[in-house]
């Protein structure tokens, strides 16, 4: 644990993880990746049959998370995690975090009482953009049958119309079997293979 948010700040709607703890130093590298330095860091981890130091020579540990350090009204710093850099894609000059977008869309759907049960954003290669997103979605039984797939797609596009262009899926695909593992993780290789198996008229 390197940061904590006061309950009153959470209730006021402050975004992020709160302020760094007293014995923690935080730093963003030139790629906006969060680095942590504290005496509470483990010295090393066991990897490939040997001890691999966790921190660099100056004591900084790279978290692998893209982040922002945002000043608050009382001049404290609030940590905001944007997403895992190993899951990020580059689209049209923007760094896009698919997992964060999935959570955002599910939240918006819940706010609008739309029966969207699961969504997974996956990248495909694009000559113009580098990569573009395609969205796999699973809806509650009966929604597509009642409204029609075209109407469902229109609803999803309206919800994402204010997003950055690089964040908006170029295509929406219904996937009735879409679900994470029992641990709540996505088997991205599996679903990427499923996506590639579809006969799609995608603009690359």
What are these regions (language model features)?
Residues 19-23, 29-59, 84, 94-96:
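Conserved ATP/PPi-binding loop(s) of AMP-dependent carboxylate-activating enzymes
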Residues 59, 64-165, 186:
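AMP-binding/adenylate-forming catalytic core of the ANL superfamily
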Residues 160-186, 203:
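AMP-binding/adenylate-forming catalytic domain of the ANL superfamily
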Residues 26-28, 65, 176-181:
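Active-site and channel-lining beta-strand-loop segments
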Residues 1-14, 48-51:
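Active-site loops of AMP-binding adenylate-forming
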Residues 195-204:
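Acidic/polar alpha-helix N-cap and adjacent early helical turns
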Residues 12, 22-24, 85-86, 184:
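A structure-centric feature marking long, well-folded core domains of fungal metabolic enzymes
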